[in-house]
Amino acid sequence: MIRDLQVVRPQTNRTRIKLCLAGPFAVGKTSLIRRFVHGDYDERYIATWGTHVTSKELEVRMGHEQTELPVLVNLWDIMGSKGLRDLRRETYFRGVQGILAVCDATRPETLPVLEGWRQTIFRVVGNVPTYVLANKAEQERAISPEELIMFCEGWGCPFLYTSAKTGESVEEAFAGLTKAVLRYLVP
């Protein structure tokens, strides 16, 4: 009989989290994801249209016992357009549990733009763990550590200089935010 049938789903104890990379165009959001997930870098600039979701499975050490927790991180790469950000905010940002707000360390005008991204996301999901990343750190930096400290003090979040090209601090950024989200979800 049909009523006796059950859908059997694979059981998993893997925690799933949704992280969003946000910021203006051409700051390296897609390249950071590529470096983190695939361990490589592509010199070509390819604009993201709409959104692109990539996943990576991690084993995260948590707690005093350093217990390994299996985590599936879903990384949402959002097109750097303000118009799209505001138009599609409910669709893209619903369920976001952490933000990597990315600016270009060589273009200081990209740092204050992050405030608009943060406000838009927070309107949808509330105050979630956030890291500010000043990407392209392998080049001559036009944003000083002091500027980043002042900017991030208002947000109450850490910042890192990252380089998708060399891999500098990329793993640290994604792993750090993942742990912050897990601590936020399970206080």
Across the structure, where does each feature detected by a protein language model lie?
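TRAFAC-class small GTPase G-domain
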Residues: M1-P187
